[in-house]
Regions:
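Short helix-loop-beta-strand segments that form the rim/entrance of peptidase-like active sites
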Residues: 1-32
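Metallocarboxypeptidase
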Residues: 13, 29-241
């Protein structure tokens, strides 16, 4: 990969550390006891307000939050239930392909881990007692925009979190550069379709388009029945109340 050529198609904005106080004191929270990764929607903290200001400025195709920690390598997209205000049909395919691209890069030449988990792909399990024979058994959902990678999805950005494996500095050193490189390659190869889908999202908003028929299949229940929670998640306003 010629990095200089790659950067003619992709530019990267890096925030090396969002929670400086937590970094200094080795805590998840800030010095005041707040968790920045639960405040992206409300933005009561300057750290979150400043990070989301960058999103508003650049309208990125992808927003990546890199942190930890879990037992293995985990790359989103998330399981259901999805945030009701997402136009999920426009980003679902991109989400899955992006996660695969990042995951393949993250484990390349990695001496500690040769596989990765993707909640949207891996957390739907067989269950002979369920009405469909399957079930979402482990919650790793994007129901709230409080998380750093979920808030930008409201504007059509493919927001994903990478969970770095616990106690594995070597894996982190391999995951981040290789994962970012294959992520950039994915954006380069899919930039037109990603821009088109973001434009479709804006068009739906400007024209007040009811896209429930397109979005509904993605609002499944625990047993992965397509559209089972669509009316609950995205009720059509009837003018009452």
């Amino acid at each position: 990969v010629n990095i200089k050529e790659l950067l003619t198609d992709v530019f990267v904005v890096i925030v090396p550390e969002q929670n400086v106080e937590g970094y200094e004191h080795m805590t998840r929270t800030t010095g005041q006891g707040y968790d920045p990764n639960r405040d992206e929607a409300n933005q009561t903290l300057f750290e979150d307000a400043n990070a989301m200001a960058l999103v508003n400025k650049f309208n990125p195709m992808v927003f990546t939050e890199i942190h930890g920690r879990v037992d293995a390598v985990l790359i989103e997209p998330c399981t259901p239930p999805h945030e009701p205000n997402y136009e999920y049909d426009l980003i679902a395919e991109q989400f899955i392909k992006l996660g695969e691209a990042v995951g393949v890069g993250a484990i390349a030449n990695n001496p500690d881990h040769n596989s990765f988990e993707m909640p949207f792909r891996d957390f739907l399990r067989g269950n002979e007692d369920s009405p469909t024979g399957k079930e979402w058994t482990q919650p790793w959902d994007d129901m709230t925009t409080a998380y750093g990678s979920q808030y930008p999805v409201l504007i059509g950005t493919a927001g994903i979190t990478w969970e770095l494996p616990v106690y594995s500095d070597i894996s982190a050193e391999y995951m981040v550069p290789y994962g970012l490189m294959t992520q950039a390659m994915f954006i380069r190869d899919n930039k037109i379709s990603m821009l088109e889908n973001q434009a479709k999202l804006f068009s739906r908003g400007v024209n007040n388009t009811n896209s429930n028929a397109d979005v509904a299949p993605w609002y499944v229940n625990q047993y992965d029945e397509a559209g089972a929670q669509a009316e609950l998640m995205r009720p059509v306003y009837d003018g009452e109340g």
